[in-house]
Amino acid sequence: MIPIVIEESGRGERAFDIYSRLLRERIIFLGEAVTSDSANRIVAQMLFLEAEDPEKDIYLYINSPGGSVYDGLGIFDTMQHIKPDVHTVCVGLAASMGAFLLCAGTKGKRSSLQHSRIMIHQPLGGAQGQASDIRIQADEILFLKERLNKELSDRTGQTLDRIQQDTDRDFFMSPTEAMNYGLIDSVIDKRPVQAVA
């Protein structure tokens, strides 16, 4: 069930679902696994916010166990494509593709709340069928692993060898450890007060 927010104005009351209300503040929330549905929703919200004001930052809050690499790369590419800076904030858990998207925010604007957990690892996949089909799937997983590791290396400042070693198995970090690793830029406990224009 999605919570409803009631807003009063001189013209009466209006009801919004909580996500629509947050979107008015340029906040997008990824609070589930990365799927084609969640990715399409997030991409559409980012494109809408860019069209509305390409100069104002977007805030992506992430509490996700990860999910589809392809759908996550769609979000990632959109984050790089749009003009507004994207602040990323981990709330709870950013694991697998969730951690990748957390790290994909604008450099200097990637953060985590203090009790969150962040986990990176290699892409997961499985294959069945004929040997030739299994080889095709294995080659694709290896391609994705190399692509994700290269992006993580570029965005964290860690060597590719270090990223490959650390993503070989689940690698959990506290926010402070993730900051020292280069996945995020700050650990926050209170939202900064926004300047009034």
Curated annotation (Swiss-Prot):
It catalyses: Hydrolysis of proteins to small peptides in the presence of ATP and magnesium. alpha-casein is the usual test substrate. In the absence of ATP, only oligopeptides shorter than five residues are hydrolyzed (such as succinyl-Leu-Tyr-|-NHMec, and Leu-Tyr-Leu-|-Tyr-Trp, in which cleavage of the -Tyr-|-Leu- and -Tyr-|-Trp bonds also occurs). The active site is at S96, H121. It holds the Pfam family CLP_protease. Its EC number is 3.4.21.92. One of its GO terms (biological process) is protein quality control for misfolded or incompletely synthesized proteins. Coiled coil: none annotated. One of its GO terms (cellular component) is endopeptidase Clp complex. GO terms for molecular function: ATP-dependent peptidase activity; ATPase binding; serine-type endopeptidase activity. Keywords: Cytoplasm, Hydrolase, Protease, Serine protease. The keyword Nucleus does not apply. Belongs to the peptidase S14 family. This is ATP-dependent Clp protease proteolytic subunit 2. It comes from Synechococcus sp. (strain CC9605).
